[in-house]
Design a protein with these regions (language model features):
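Short, charged, surface-exposed hinge/linker loops at domain edges
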Residues: 1-4, 33, 37-67
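Short aromatic-glycine-(Arg/Gly/Cys) micro-motifs in beta-strand/loop hairpins
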Residues: 8-22
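A short, exposed loop/beta-hairpin motif centered on an aromatic-Gly-Thr core
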Residues: 23-33
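Intrinsically disordered, low-complexity segments enriched in proline/serine/threonine
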Residues: 22-25, 60-62
Length: 67
């Protein structure tokens, strides 16, 4: 499974990061790195919950960060 994290800076200075392949994985951070870290953690949590609920089968995961 190939996932990507996209980020952008909001007008108020906060950073927004999301994983488009996982609806609902959208987080804010004070810095870009903070937002990216939070998005990665949330994405892994969502995938783990899906596996626990039998909604998928284990497969290698690759997460890339869009520039």
């Amino acid at each position: 499974m190939q996932l990507s994290i996209e980020s952008e800076r909001e007008e108020d200075g906060r950073w927004l990061a999301e994983v488009p392949q996982l609806p609902g994985v959208l987080v804010y951070g004070k810095t870009r790195n903070e937002a990216l870290s939070k998005a990665q953690i949330l994405a892994l949590r969502v995938l783990a919950e899906r596996l626990e609920n039998g909604e998928g089968s284990p497969e290698p995961i690759s997460i890339s960060i869009a520039a």
